[in-house]
Amino acid sequence: MPQDLTPGQLLARGACRCLVEHGFACVTELVPKPGLRVDVMALGRKGEIWVVECKSGRADFTSDHKWRGYLDYADRFFWAVDADFPAEILPADTGLIRADRFGGEIARMAPELRLAPARRKAVTQGFARTAALRLQGRTDPGLPLAPGPAGVTFSP
């Protein structure tokens, strides 16, 4: 395991392991539109889309003013936090994953928001393109990919 992962990246790793156990495929640091970058987007077997924001502490959470914008790209929205995080400060109408670098568990299921069909199609295509281009970039590091901090940006 790389030693230079941030606390948030370690939480994302654990959250992804948890979601894979629930039948999801995950992409980290995905940019659904300029100015937004979700920590984890997960695609389920039935096409459901979950977004997970990883928070390493109270200050990390209270300084995040963009998270409500992620609701437009998810059927369910979760926070991933460690065992010491004060869960009572998280909005009650969101999901909760308790995670560490080894895995996680869903402590509170998020309510279902249900994306509109056109948005679902665009988000799913953006997810697929991001995953495919990242995989291609790993096998061909010299390949120029689309711009964006995470490899690609899509705007459904």
Residue ranges of predicted features:
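Non-catalytic C-terminal interaction segments of nucleic acid-processing enzymes
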Residues: 2-4, 9-34, 89-156
